[in-house]
Amino acid sequence: MYGEQQMKLKNFLIVVKDIERSRQFYEDLFGLEMLVDNDGNMVLSDGLALQEEKYWKEFLGKEIIPESNSCELYFEEADIEGFIKKLESMYPEVKYVNRLMTHSWGQKVIRFYDPDGNLIEVGTPI
C-alpha cells in the first residue's frame, strides 16, 4: 500500500462543449447537483465531473471523438418507462443508441447520447 491510506476512485470525468448545458442535462434527468464549480471544470454529485472540451484539448493535445462508444455512464431506474417519458418530454432531440429493450437476463435498458456524444445507459435494477 502506498502511504497510509488506500487509493480510491474519486470521480469520473466526461468532456463537454458547454458545461452549463451539460450541468442542466444531468440535473434535469438524473437529479445530480453541482458540488464544485471551477473555471471549465465542474463536479456533480455521485462522482460525475464535467470538463470543458477547450481545456481538455489543451491538456491532452488531442481531438475529442464524440459517440466513440468506448465507455458509458450507467444509471439504474426502477420506473424505466417513466424515465423514458421524462427524457422524451425534456429532451425530444435525444439520439438513441437503442430504445427500450430487454436483455436475456431480464433487465430492461435504453442507451442514448448526452448532448456531447457521451454514451448513457439507464437500466432497471439488476
What are these regions (language model features)?
Residues M1-R21, C71-L73:
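N-terminal beta-strand motif that seeds the catalytic metal site of vicinal oxygen chelate
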Residues Y2-Q5, K85-I126:
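Vicinal oxygen chelate
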Residues K8, G40, D46, N69-C71:
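Residues that flank catalytic or metal-binding motifs in active/ligand-binding sites
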Residues L13-W56:
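Core segments of cupin and vicinal oxygen chelate
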Residues D18-I19, A78-I80:
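Helix N-cap motif at beta-to-alpha junctions
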Residues F25, E81-L87:
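Short amphipathic alpha-helices within nucleic acid-binding modules
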Residues M42, C71, G106-I110:
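Short beta-strand micro-motifs in enzyme catalytic cores
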Residues F59-E63:
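Short, P/G- and charge-enriched loop/turn segments at secondary-structure junctions
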